[in-house]
Amino acid sequence: MAASAFLLITSFLLILMLLAKPLGNIIANLIDGDIPRWLTKIESGLWRCCGLQKPGGTVKEMNWWQYALAITIFNLTGLLLLFTLLVTQHALPLNPEHFPGLKWDLALNTAISFITNTDWQAYSGENTLSYFSQMTGLTVQNFLSAATGIAVAFALIRTFSRHGVNTAGNAWVDITRITLYLLLPLSMVIALVFVSQGVIQNFEPYQLAHTIEGQPQLIPMGPVASQEAIKLLGTNGGGFFGANSSHPFENPTAISNFIQILSIFLIPCALCFAFGQVVGDNRQGHTLLWAMSIIFVIATVGVMYAELKGNLHFSLLGANSNINMEGKENRFGILATSIYAVVTTAASCGAVNAMHDSFTALGGMIPMWLIQIGEVVFGGVGSGLYGMLLFVLLTVFIAGLMIGRAPEYLGKKIEVFEMKMVALAILVTPTLALLGTALTISTASGRAGILNPGAHGFSEVLYALSSTANNNGSAFAGLNTNNMFYNLLLAIILFLGRFGMILPVLAIAGSLAVKKRQPASNGTLPTYGPLFISLLILTIMLIGALTFIPALILGPVIEHLQIWLMAR
């Protein structure tokens, strides 16, 4: 089993790097605006019609607050349109099952969830949403929310390579190029591969079948493959079906499962290569990749070990429980399920091919912790990179205090304003998660949704609030969240968790763009190599430990100890 785990992890990382390196070159060209001439001519007319072009033919650039305003307006418009679509879906076409419109609180929760790249789902798609809502509502927002995150990363990357300017690019141009030149082509290829593996893609009404017991069963249909591709590539995670990627129509084979985890990490990994290329020092991108990969491997091994040890609940009942297969698909097994769980929570994806609620206490704690540290281990498309860069700036600042030098990164001095914004961005999601958890367990409405008692019930609440605050979207289940209290609370946390981080990141970008690049000296801290990688990992672990260890002790740690003591 150890050899199989080693082969799976190493082959996954090797193939990922081989695919991400050339894609990183393409992304670097998009960041620098290096577009083929024939596309430039087409774009020129579009930018001119939209008023985005200067008289000389160059694109008008924005300062950081204009960029932030454009991003915010764009997403609020998407929120309004998606909300309207969901509440009126009964009057719209492609609704063969005649589903009614969603209640306003569920529609608001769903709309905010999808515009924030979270895809938290308090419903099952196959018995709630029409094909039209899935395609023109959710799938479209999967593209646009992913493009938003990548655009913010583009703006931040540019400011490390520029100096003495106050612009970070043009949000409208970035979102358009990311969608048309990056997300759409890759999604089309991945969707075709999924279809070849058996993922369905049709507009047929649900099919009536009879089981071997003679009972009728309604089998849902729909355009799944087209939504599945961007769900994973854009680290969105919202499933066409309630069972998500454990459903055989979404993820039928071991090959499709492997392609899914590759798709989740592909763009976040490629962005690291692109970052190194744009700033003119590939070692900087490689440093981020090494730090991410080390944490990823440790987390994956931890989950595999916990799940291979078996479930003590079954042992207490006298059942043979050498491994914990509860809540998992036999076609994937322990190893493929474990690596999927780590990938989807390390990234802000949230797609699942098993029930995380059925993992062992420690096996479920690791994915939860990966969410809580801000999903910076590869992370979401765009958000993973700018989240990791926040920790890089914090590491540089701490190291500067230790050696008595003014902190700087890539020749830019890191001063008071940048550190205030770093602190704000890093603390906003833990604050939302912990305060939301406290509010939930201290109110009758919150406790009414908890279906499991004790430490595990607390873990389910903590996971849900951590997932929504960090824009992941996965859940432990066992929590009834489709009610007014949870829909509104989680909607607020979803929105604040997304934009409460984006705005400080763009403010940092605006501040760095103005600064001159300082030449490196003998006293400059190298931000590459084993020493800095170790410092970066320790900083991430330290922040995660100080912030969430008390809450994790109340949940999964106590649950594990209770079961262990009962089994003795």
From Swiss-Prot:
<feature type="transmembrane region" description="Helical">
    <location>
        <begin position="535"/>
        <end position="555"/>
    </location>
</feature>
<feature type="transmembrane region" description="Helical">
    <location>
        <begin position="137"/>
        <end position="157"/>
    </location>
</feature>
<keyword id="KW-1133">Transmembrane helix</keyword>
<keyword id="KW-0812">Transmembrane</keyword>
<feature type="transmembrane region" description="Helical">
    <location>
        <begin position="488"/>
        <end position="508"/>
    </location>
</feature>
<feature type="transmembrane region" description="Helical">
    <location>
        <begin position="421"/>
        <end position="441"/>
    </location>
</feature>
<dbReference type="Pfam" id="PF03814">
    <property type="entry name" value="KdpA"/>
</dbReference>
<keyword id="KW-0997">Cell inner membrane</keyword>
<feature type="transmembrane region" description="Helical">
    <location>
        <begin position="361"/>
        <end position="381"/>
    </location>
</feature>
<comment type="similarity">
    <text>Belongs to the KdpA family.</text>
</comment>
<dbReference type="GO" id="GO:0005886">
    <property type="term" value="C:plasma membrane"/>
</dbReference>
<feature type="transmembrane region" description="Helical">
    <location>
        <begin position="384"/>
        <end position="404"/>
    </location>
</feature>
<keyword id="KW-0472">Membrane</keyword>
<keyword id="KW-1003">Cell membrane</keyword>
<keyword id="KW-0633">Potassium transport</keyword>
<comment type="function">
    <text>Part of the high-affinity ATP-driven potassium transport (or Kdp) system, which catalyzes the hydrolysis of ATP coupled with the electrogenic transport of potassium into the cytoplasm. This subunit binds the periplasmic potassium ions and delivers the ions to the membrane domain of KdpB through an intramembrane tunnel.</text>
</comment>
<dbReference type="GO" id="GO:0030955">
    <property type="term" value="F:potassium ion binding"/>
</dbReference>
<feature type="transmembrane region" description="Helical">
    <location>
        <begin position="7"/>
        <end position="27"/>
    </location>
</feature>
<feature type="transmembrane region" description="Helical">
    <location>
        <begin position="332"/>
        <end position="352"/>
    </location>
</feature>
<keyword id="KW-0630">Potassium</keyword>
<protein>
    <recommendedName>
        <fullName>Potassium-transporting ATPase potassium-binding subunit</fullName>
    </recommendedName>
</protein>
<feature type="transmembrane region" description="Helical">
    <location>
        <begin position="258"/>
        <end position="278"/>
    </location>
</feature>
<feature type="transmembrane region" description="Helical">
    <location>
        <begin position="180"/>
        <end position="200"/>
    </location>
</feature>
<feature type="transmembrane region" description="Helical">
    <location>
        <begin position="288"/>
        <end position="308"/>
    </location>
</feature>
<keyword id="KW-0813">Transport</keyword>
<feature type="transmembrane region" description="Helical">
    <location>
        <begin position="67"/>
        <end position="87"/>
    </location>
</feature>
<dbReference type="InterPro" id="IPR004623">
    <property type="entry name" value="KdpA"/>
</dbReference>
<keyword id="KW-0406">Ion transport</keyword>
<comment type="subunit">
    <text>The system is composed of three essential subunits: KdpA, KdpB and KdpC.</text>
</comment>
<dbReference type="GO" id="GO:0008556">
    <property type="term" value="F:P-type potassium transmembrane transporter activity"/>
</dbReference>
